A protein has these predicted regions:
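Electrostatic, structured charged patches in enzyme active sites and in nucleic-acid/phosphate-binding
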Residues: 1-139
Length: 139
């Protein structure tokens, strides 16, 4: 779950299964989005989904809401292991889990990464706050 008011490093990519441009705010979210796009069991991907009718929904968004090929929805939140037990992270994950359970979605999970990858790998389109992405902007 992310705070939509936070301005941070942004990676953009067009995924085949996402109807809009995919925005990732860290390397874990970016890599997992690509993995979902390549997964034959996933039919559709929505990223950074607003929590409608949730008091925190104006500011926080779920990382991934997907529709599987069997028609069932799936929700995933991306978290780095070192942030997993921080009180705010726990609070946001609980909000997300309870929100989606209230909508009848039981396939809710957390994607955990041991480490943060360097963003300096070639081929990742990067835009910084206040900067628009352009294909020539690779770090």
């Amino acid at each position: 779950m992310r705070n939509s008011n936070t301005h941070s490093l942004t990676m953009k990519k067009k995924l085949k299964k996402d109807k809009s441009i995919f925005y990732a705010y860290n390397e874990l979210q970016y890599r997992y989005g690509i993995k979902l796009d390549e997964n034959p069991d996933i039919l559709e991907i929505q990223d950074n989904v607003k929590l409608v009718d949730c008091p925190q929904g104006d500011f926080y968004r779920t990382d991934f809401y997907c529709i599987k090929t069997n028609g069932e929805p799936m929700v995933r939140e991306c978290v780095y292991k070192d942030k997993l037990l921080k009180p705010m992270t726990v609070k946001l994950l609980d909000i997300s889990r309870n929100y989606w359970l209230s909508k009848g979605i039981t396939d809710w999970g957390i994607v955990i990464s041991e480490k943060e990858w360097p963003i300096s790998q070639p081929g990742y389109p990067i835009s910084r706050p206040g900067q628009h992405w352009h294909p020539s902007l690779y770090i």
